[in-house]
Amino acid sequence: MSKFKVIEIKEDARPRDFEAFQLRLASPEKIKSWSYGEVKKPETINYRTLKPERDGLFCAKIFGPIRDYECLCGKYKKMRFKGVKCEKCGVEVANSKVRRSRMGHIELVTPVAHIWYVNSLPSRIGTLLGVKMKDLERVLYYEAYIVENPGDAFYDNESTKKVEYCDVLNEEQYQNLMQRYENSGFKARMGGEVVRDLLANLDLVALLNQLKEEMAATNSEAKKKTIIKRLKVVENFLNSNLNANADSDEAVPNRPEWMMITNLPVLPPDLRPLVALDGGKFAVSDVNDLYRRVINRNTRLKKLMELDAPEIIIRNEKRMLQEAVDALFDNGRRANAVKGANKRPLKSLSEIIKGKQGRFRQNLLGKRVDFSGRSVIVVGPKLRMDQCGLPKKMALELFKPHLLAKLEEKGYATTVKQAKKMIENKTNEVWECLEEVVKGHPVMLNRAPTLHKLSIQAFHPVLVEGKAIQLHPLVCAAFNADFDGDQMAVHVPLSQEAIAECKVLMLSSMNILLPASGKSVTVPSQDMVLGIYYLSLEKAGAKGSHKICTGIDEVMMALESKCLDIHASIQTMVDGRKITTTAGRLIIKSILPDFVPENSWNKVLKKKDIAALVDYVYKQGGLEITASFLDRLKNLGFEYATKAGISISIADIIVPNDKQKAIDEAKKQVREIQNSYNLGLITSGERYNKIIDIWKSTNNVLSKEMMKLVEKDKEGFNSIYMMADSGARGSAAQISQLAAMRGLMTKPDGSIIETPIISNFREGLNVLEYFISTHGARKGLADTALKTANAGYLTRKLIDVAQNVKITIEDCGTHEGVEINEITADSSIIETLEERILGRVLAEDVIDPITNSVLFAEGTLMDEEKAKILGESGIKSVNIRTPITCKAKKGICAKCYGINLGEGKLVKPGEAVGIISAQSIGEPGTQLTLRTFHSGGTASTDLQDRQVSAQKEGFIRFYNLKTYKNKEGKNIVANRRNAAILLVEPKIKTPFKGVINIENIHEDVIVSIKNKKQEVKYILRKYDLAKPNELAGVSGSIDGKLYLPYQSGMQVEENESIVEVIKEGWNVPNRIPFASEILVEDGEPVVQNIKAGEKGTLKFYILKGDGLDRVKNVKKGDIVKEKGFFVVIADENDREAKRHYIPRESKIEFNDSEKIDDANTIIASAPKKERKVIAEWDAYNNTIIAEIDGVVSFEDIEAGYSADEQIDEATGKRSLVINEYLPSGVRPTLVIAGKGDKAVRYQLEPKTVIFVHDGDKIAQADILAKTPKAAAKSKDITGGLPRVSELFEARKPKNAAVIAEIDGVVRFDKPLRSKERIIIQAEDGTSAEYLIDKSKHIQVRDGEFIHAGEKLTDGVVSSHDVLKILGEKALHYYLISEIQQVYRGQGVVISDKHIEVIVSQMLRQVKVVDSGHTKFIEGDLVSRRKFREENERIIRMGGEPAIAEPVLLGVTRAAIGSDSVISAASFQETTKVLTEASIAGKFDYLEDLKENVILGRMIPVGTGLYGEQNLKLKEQE
């Protein structure tokens, strides 16, 4: 039935290759068939003759000869006797290598349990028999009896409690039952034998059916869980032969009794060697000791059985045998570990394979490599980009075989021996041949730690004297190397394919871009930057200024003859235009390729400009041009850095003159603050923050002063200023530490010490200041060490989860995508849309919002130019293809991945993108911070925390917004959620008065206006409309989306706007809190000064329907009266360059058709001031306002009990303040009784100040109380590396928020067991119920409408909830923006696609909800691929497919849950993985990287993807 044949591995006939790998339980017969004889004695070797003992653990008769083709007694000693068995010593003459593969066995007198199947959770034997693990252990270790046949036995005398099959009894119960029921068939035993018999008697098929019936019958969740556990084990046993051939002995499924061992296999002796040390001692592998204990106990037990010893002694011996076998398989798993002679636990078989020092990670995944060497590196500034200096001594060793061949080929030596001698004597011929051998033979250099693919690159070696490897300066950044003693390893590629790959793919001149971000990594740094910066500076009045030179040759002559200064400003011709530049910049121009435009080089070149230059050259010119350009740049940089002769002198450090004055002023302010604190006017927190603010601003003022001085010094040629300004070394902050003041320092916990360091390094620090600065600095060093380990572990987990992701096909053909927009955090942009879209493929057409034409069609690959056009077009969100939505069967398709950032081209099939992604995320891990940030407990007073104001122009729309009018006549927000204020511009206006109708058809929305005479229809894309949950601020973003202000059936006037584009939105409560004051009216225009933005001719238009009509009679000074007024700036070809909406009340500043020459000209101006404030609120307090008119009453509010009375000194008013710590069960509440039986309750938080009295009459919108915001305790924000690993591990947060799962109206039910009950009722009648702990703060109100995904309580949103409620795309958005916030915050650029690849792997498993007719059980986690294949199989057979829901697994869980056994076992929890796999007879089809590396096969990526097909090379025409 299967396509696989089992390969019998014989020692001489090893298969060259195999297709799959299966793990199974071995039957006793199987073990016997492997064995070459029984090991009877515990002896190892005879210590006198040093020959192995017969029948012992190293016996030559069982395991094979010690020396090649030579029997033990020496009778047969030649190759020709191969296969002969010696009569005298019984040894077969063979190669001694067979001692690595021949196994023996030990026949155990009594069956013992394999500890993996007893103790590894869940216990497999226990689960099958339905016995608890603890009870099973008691039976196996002869402490309890297990019922084999219950007969008619009952536990009690009334015969009510029947004794069941497999019940576990203690000694007392057993004796009691034996007395009463021995004759009626009752039988119970203890030990391994009875367990083996019970397992052998199991009828698995009957058990399976019985369990399935029980499953259908039960309703209890707990019971279901235990049944499912058993079901899984039973199914695994039954399915363990699915892929075997029917005729082979593999066709028998695994049997449960095979988990008990009767024949114990013995490992081949060369795998547990015994090595003689000098001094007559022996080093022994621990396994030998463990085997010896098993053999000793087994023989003793045999003897005791023959002697018919008392039961108790035999039992004890059997128990000891069980313990000895346990220790052999997994020492220390159960009882205390067995210790050797030197008091350390012996290493058992399990320990040999697991962990960092185990077989998998130490010997199979990381091997030592032949033809390699390592040495210290030094800089090689004269090398070309693709060269490295290789010491002659190293080359001699590394290329020895090649060299020997070369010497013979050239006839210098006739024999190998002679050639070797020549090499030893290092004759001249040897060096000559070495040069030839090395030429054209690249070598690979590697610097540990190898964090990404650029840590191994190939170079052409250049032979150098000395013992150090020379490295090109520009590749240092990629290797993260410096020359303070770093070492690097050299590897020689041997095969022709390997050499070709080195030359084509790995040469350093090919690896110019970082695979993480697509930025160039070979950018000049330090000295080179300094040299180029120096060269590009301009000096006023330098020698030879304002001369006219024809070109570079003339400039060079003038420089040499000293009649022209390098910084002099000169005039010259470039590309037929006269330009002003400097002599130095012309020199730079001379090394640039011709296509570089003038504005890229004719300026002061700092590090960023040089990086941009390199990027530009690469994008325009390609690899070869860039590589040679970089070399010229490096030479120029070094040359002029030397000529500049920049050095640091104490005279360069200039201390500001009025430093003392500024410091005295600051000290005075600090004293004042301290006094007001002593008087009790401010709190200690305020005092601390204010003092820190004073010192920060003082420091900033001084730094600015100092920078001004340094900049003016020597006309900008101050050495220290040049270093910092060019970006070569140092920063403004460091200079200010040298020259202004050192500033504020941090404590090890990250908080700021309030006494600053006033001195700078030029003046020197005093003792106290020195002590303060060491305080935080040492913490920094300790952090770095810890960080490296954490970052390394994160990388390892990521690699493991993503190693099987590769590009398999060109296009999977999906139309699905994920909508992306710019990532923002607190109104600062973290990643722009332009950056996010770069190198991706569109999943939907992009429509130009201005012309409504298709800007880019679906399937377009967005390169830099297109991304730029898109960024400028004002589009706010785009749908792109991502690895998460890719439909490829295996791996990912090229289109869903996009550009391979390391090359800048569309990725090719065979690229191992998973590993690249994991490296890209892990490599900068060491640059992230470790600490969690403490935010202080004070409310900040930034403007954005008190109000929101409009940044763009348009008019206001209220979405669902309700307001109250208070006594002062102000509008107060009455909504707590699901409302927003939008700033919009019109897109479609009604051509006539009529009734609006809106209908959804598939992907389109049709808006129509109809009256008795006529009807018009407008078609919109559904995808462009803002969804209700986006408007409410629950998910997604609304910028640039469309908004429909009217509902179907409404009457609309002529010229009314019915479709609008949202330009900005402020939702309640995220951007506008409840009870804020609204300062705008619905429909009110928001006017700003509008700048042209482009040069060109002005043309005015008015919106009619969905098109623009030209308006020509517009004059300067006109005021716009009508909605829908637009201005277009047309360029010289009369194409639209820019379009602006001009709101009503704007004043026009130009006539129609006037020309604009400056893009910053204001075309239309605001009559009053710009930046209209939309809403304001109290920055320090959360206000509680009355929602109805009525009478206040207090509940649980009592002065002196739950509240304190406070008297305001200034006004003499009394108010109550709720205590911070309340007695349990006390819940202070304000109740307003309104008309009828209407009542509203407000539960008050601690520290709330109450402004009303019991029994007061109040009106709607009156302020009842205020809760100070600072009372919200300061939260620790997890940041940096811990945050990243928290997200990738998908940990459930400690204080997770409860999240609504459906849209609906909130109802509070009566509390249950001191928990609040919230019920959400949806429109369609469904409801969801939540029980919420009293400790949580509930954020919703009775009767509010809430969207799925909104928080019901405070806390952190868990990514599992995001997936469950909002789906995969929302999770995609959430995870990427959270992770990017950490990396971008540290200034690290990583492309989104890398995070997406990892997220797609975290989502690679699904949870079966309904199993249908498939072989799955509900609750199973299976990989999507297995799930899909199984469903396809069932559907073909006409059955009911399974249904599953996506689950999010952390990277560790996802890696262990890999479809490949070998890969999972080599990652973590080795024993558990192997246990499961062996019972289920799992197959590993060797499809991914890791398992192939372990087995030493070609890995299936890159050229290995086509390993089967023969590649043909063809010459290029």
Curated annotation (Swiss-Prot):
It comes from the Bacteria. InterPro entries: DNA-dir_RpoC_beta_prime, DNA-dir_RpoC_beta_prime_bact, RNA_pol_asu, RNA_pol_N, RNA_pol_Rpb1_1, RNA_pol_Rpb1_3, RNA_pol_Rpb1_3_sf, RNA_pol_Rpb1_4. It catalyses: RNA(n) + a ribonucleoside 5'-triphosphate = RNA(n+1) + diphosphate. The keyword Nucleotidyltransferase applies. This is DNA-directed RNA polymerase subunit beta'. It holds the Pfam family RNA_pol_Rpb1_3. Mg(2+) binds at residues 482, 484, 486. Its cofactor is Mg(2+); Zn(2+). GO terms for molecular function: DNA binding; DNA-directed RNA polymerase activity; magnesium ion binding; zinc ion binding. Zn(2+) 1 binds at residues 71, 73, 86, 89. Binds 1 Mg(2+) ion per subunit. Binds 2 Zn(2+) ions per subunit. Zn(2+) 2 binds at residues 812, 886, 893, 896.
